[in-house]
A protein has these predicted regions:
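Alpha-helical transmembrane segments
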Residues: 18-29, 134-142
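Transmembrane alpha-helical segments of multi-pass membrane proteins
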Residues: 23, 51, 76-92
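Alpha-helical membrane-associated segments of multi-pass integral membrane proteins
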Residues: 104-150
Length: 154
């Protein structure tokens, strides 16, 4: 293993670099989630789910990335797949158990003229589709884990 970080980075496959970028995105999402959930964390247990998952993804995913060729890829795939569950639960909780109605509400805003709120006060409810960010991170991560390249050696 290279001791120089630049050499180490250059030795990584494209897939490993993509996973590293996704983990960086998860770090930013964790910081944003902590800020956005600051009040609700004291009110309900399920507000902790995305923070716990993002922290697990960073710590477990970072360790797994270092062992990419020795089982780390499979661990990362499982962690990224878990993101789909967390995203779905988040949409469920953000919508108060009525995801279809809230998704319809989000999509119907395209019919509103710019500058109008459609009768919904900004900040009066959690953003229904925000948890789908975990679907995006999970999708990119899974593609990187399941796409084989010549540099991966497996």
């Amino acid at each position: 293993m290279a001791t120089n970080p630049v050499v180490w980075w250059r030795e990584r496959s494209l897939n490993e670099r993509v996973v590293a970028a996704v983990l960086g995105g998860a770090a930013l999402l964790l910081a944003e989630l902590r800020f956005e959930h600051r009040e609700v964390l004291g009110e309900t247990w399920h507000a902790w789910l995305p923070l716990g998952y993002a922290a697990l993804l960073l710590v477990g995913g970072g360790a797994a990335l270092l062992r990419w060729q020795r089982g780390g890829r499979r661990i990362l795939a499982a962690l990224f797949a878990l993101g789909f569950v967390i995203g779905a639960l988040g949409i469920w909780f953000h919508s108060g158990g009525h995801p279809v109605a809230h998704v319809w509400s989000v999509l119907s805003t395209w019919q509103l003229p710019p500058g109008q709120n459609g009768g919904i006060k900004v900040g009066s409810q959690p953003p229904a589709l925000a948890p789908a960010a975990f679907w995006g991170l999970g999708s990119i991560g899974l593609i990187a884990c399941f796409t084989r390249t010549s540099h991966d050696g497996t």
